[in-house]
């Protein structure tokens, strides 16, 4: 469920003194069962968060999918938000397995399920992030180059570009399908990334785990968090700057949805990425390959990030105009206003408003 390797060989397989800071290792070797450390009430709280995300995410994104297919006109915006809702819907569907993993305190579904599940999770994760970038860039181009957008911004091209986003997401998560495996640690089976060979010595194996962890964590942080965040934020700034130059007094309005989306993305996913970096630091500096409490904290921060996917449908509807006004509208009209940028287009200077 995390973006980096989580399991290692058992204590007896490693050279003495390699993991000098992992005191939990010797303490647990006398137990034949799977024992895991707890961090207060973090495990049950994580299960509650995942449960809420499953219900809200499946229902909310499912409703958006149904309405964009059957109740709304097919435009560039509805194509983009359909694929974003699909990615969030897929991520929400995968959460029951994540919850089972956390409750069981170990991976019990086998190696191939480990490969397929983690690949599916990160396909949804990267697709959602890349689609947010795609939507932001699309709206930015529509504002900065309205004439070009009028001639080239078509539903067919948007569909092909969205398909390309899914291919990019598949490429970004393909390493999980090849290198994910399972291994027991202190009686607990975990699903983790393994770039190494079982025939290597313990010291070489440790170095391989750390090297793979560095590559995976930095790549995930840049491609799955910092990069999308920078692009979305830049697009929001460029939109507002262009409209201010053209004398639109309500320049903050079209920026509002992008601002809320990027803020929600940052708030909910930043803990997960910070924990990833802390986990990397502990492995590189403290030579700590595995720590059960860090694994639980990583799982909890991932659960918090999943809340973002379940909230996106509500952000589409309730951001842009006053909540009270949209609450009494039909849902179709509210989504149309969000996806079609009705309030933005109707307020742009005439002749400059981009069209679908």
Swiss-Prot record:
Transmembrane segment boundaries: 45-67, 79-100, 117-137, 157-178, 221-241, 258-280, 301-320
Cellular-component GO terms for this entry: plasma membrane
Topology feature Extracellular, residues: 1-44, 101-116, 179-220, 281-300
Disulfide bonds: 114-191
Nucleotide-binding recorded as keyword: no
Tissues in which the protein is found: Expressed in resting primary human macrophages.
Keyword entries, A-Z: Cell membrane, Disulfide bond, G-protein coupled receptor, Glycoprotein, Membrane, Receptor, Transducer, Transmembrane, Transmembrane helix
Cytoplasmic membrane side: 68-78, 138-156, 242-257, 321-356
Pfam families per UniProt: 7tm_1
Compartment(s) where it occurs, according to its Swiss-Prot or TrEMBL record: Cell membrane
Family: Belongs to the G-protein coupled receptor 1 family.
PANTHER family: CHEMOTACTIC RECEPTOR, G-PROTEIN COUPLED RECEPTOR 32-RELATED
Described function: G-protein coupled receptor that binds to several ligands including resolvin D1 (RvD1) with high affinity, leading to rapid and transient activation of numerous intracellular signaling pathways. In macrophages, enhances the RvD1-stimulated phagocytic and clearance functions. Macrophages migrate less toward different chemoattractant stimuli but phagocytose more microbial particles. Prevents the increase in Ca(2+) and activation of ERK1/2 used by histamine and its H1 receptor subtype to induce goblet cell secretion by activating PKC and GRK2 to counter-regulate the histamine receptor.
Protein name: Probable G-protein coupled receptor 32
Species per Swiss-Prot/TrEMBL record: Homo sapiens (Human)
């Amino acid at each position: 469920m995390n973006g980096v390797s989580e399991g290692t060989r058992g204590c007896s397989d490693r050279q003495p003194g390699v993991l000098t800071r992992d005191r939990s290792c010797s303490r647990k070797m006398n137990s034949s069962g799977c024992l895991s450390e707890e961090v207060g009430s973090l495990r049950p709280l994580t299960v509650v968060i995942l449960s809420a995300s499953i219900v809200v995410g499946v229902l909310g994104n499912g409703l958006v999918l149904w309405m964009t297919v059957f109740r709304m006109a097919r435009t560039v915006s509805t194509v983009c938000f359909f694929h974003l809702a699909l990615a969030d819907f897929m991520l929400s569907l995968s959460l029951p397995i994540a919850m089972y993993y956390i409750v069981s305190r170990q991976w019990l579904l086998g190696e191939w399920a480990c490969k397929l599940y983690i690949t599916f999770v990160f396909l949804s994760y990267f697709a959602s992030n890349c689609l947010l970038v795609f939507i932001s860039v699309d709206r930015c181009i529509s504002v900065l180059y309205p004439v070009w957008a009028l001639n080239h911004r078509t539903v067919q091209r948007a569909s092909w570009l969205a398909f390309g986003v899914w291919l990019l997401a598949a490429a970004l998560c393909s390493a999980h399908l090849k290198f994910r495996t399972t291994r027991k640690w202190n009686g607990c089976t975990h699903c983790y990334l393994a770039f190494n060979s079982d025939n290597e010595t313990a010291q070489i194996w440790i170095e391989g785990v750390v090297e793979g962890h560095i590559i995976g964590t930095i790549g995930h942080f840049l491609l799955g968090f910092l990069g999308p965040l920078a692009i979305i934020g830049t697009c929001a700034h460029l939109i507002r700057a262009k409209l201010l130059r053209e004398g639109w007094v309500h320049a903050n309005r079209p920026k509002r949805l992008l601002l809320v989306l990027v803020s929600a993305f940052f708030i909910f996913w930043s803990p997960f990425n910070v924990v990833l970096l802390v986990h990397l630091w502990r492995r590189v500096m403290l030579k700590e390959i595995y720590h059960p409490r860090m694994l639980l904290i990583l799982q909890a921060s991932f659960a918090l990030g999943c809340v973002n996917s379940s909230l996106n449908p509500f952000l589409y509807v309730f951001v842009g105009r006053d909540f009270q006004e949209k609450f009494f509208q039909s849902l179709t009209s509210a989504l149309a206003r969000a996806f079609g940028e009705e309030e933005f287009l109707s307020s742009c200077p005439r002749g400059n408003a981009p069209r679908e």
